[in-house]
Amino acid sequence: MRAESRYTRVRGLLTHARVRGEGPPLVIVPGLGCASWMYARVARQLAPGRTVYAYDPPGHGLSAGRPGSPRTIEGLTNHLAAWLTEAGLGRVPLLGHSLGAEVIFDLAARHPGHVSAVIACAPTGIPENPSVRVQLGRLLLDLPRERPGLFLPALAAYTRSGPARMLRLAQNQSEHDTGPLLPHVRAPTLLLDGTHDPVIQAWTLEAICAAIPDATVREIPGGTHALTDSFPQTVARYTLDFLREAKA
C-alpha cells in the first residue's frame, strides 16, 4: 500500500502530509525536528484499518516554512488546527510522538472540536519542563538504543528542520506549561510508554494520566523513545484496539 504526498495551503504555506491506507482518518503529529518519512513503519501497520495522515509541521519534512517560525508550541498547535480545517478532516483521532504529543494535548484542550481521541506516544515536556541541556542529554542516552536504520532518515529530517528552529522550539518547550490544560482534554486518551526510554520519566506519565479525565497508560516492554519506529506493530495494535473501544 503506497503512500502519496498531499499538499494543502494553510496561512500561505504549502503544508504536506504523507497519506496511506483506507478507512477513517488518523493523523500522526511528529516530534521535535522530525518528519513524516520517519513514521513510515508505524503508518504501514496502521494503514489496513485507517487512512493515515503523517503530517509535517511548518518548516519540517516537505512542508514550507518561514524564517524564525514556528517559535512556540502554541504556534505549532494553531497551524495544526488550521490544517485540519483546510484539509477537511473534521474531528479526528491524533497520534502525537514526543513533542507532537504535547501539541495534540494543547489541541484537544484549546480546539476540542478537532479531536475525537488522543494517542500520546512518549510525550515530552509535561509536567517537568526539562531544560534544553537536560533534553539533549537524555536524547543522547537514547540514541544507541534506537534502530540503526532510523539514523539517516532522522538526520535528513533534522537537517531540513535546521538547528535554529529546533533550538527555538526546545527552548519554548522548557517554558511552555501544558499541565493546566490537561484537565480540559475531554477526548479519550491513550498514553504509550516505552520501558527503555530515558527521555521520559515514569512519574510524568502517571501525572498526565491523573490529570486527564479519561486516560489510560500502556507500557511497551523494551520500548525506546522512538516507539513508533522501534515497535511499530505494538504501537499500531494498541492504537487500533483503543480507537475501536473508544469508537473514535
Segments predicted by a language model, with ranges:
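Alpha/beta-hydrolase fold catalytic core
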Residues: 1-26, 47-50, 89-90, 160, ...
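Active-site loop/oxyanion-hole signature of alpha/beta-hydrolase fold enzymes
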Residues: 10, 18, 53-95, 237
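Conserved HGGG/HGGXW glycine-rich cap/lid loop of the alpha/beta-hydrolase fold
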Residues: 13-62
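Conserved hydrolase catalytic core segment
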Residues: 90-129
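Hydrophobic, aromatic-rich cap/lid helix
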Residues: 151-180
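Short beta-strand/loop motif that positions the catalytic acidic residue
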Residues: 184-185, 191-193, 197
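Acidic catalytic loop of the alpha/beta-hydrolase fold
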Residues: 195-200, 225-226
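Catalytic histidine-centered segment of alpha/beta-hydrolase-like enzymes
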Residues: 223-234
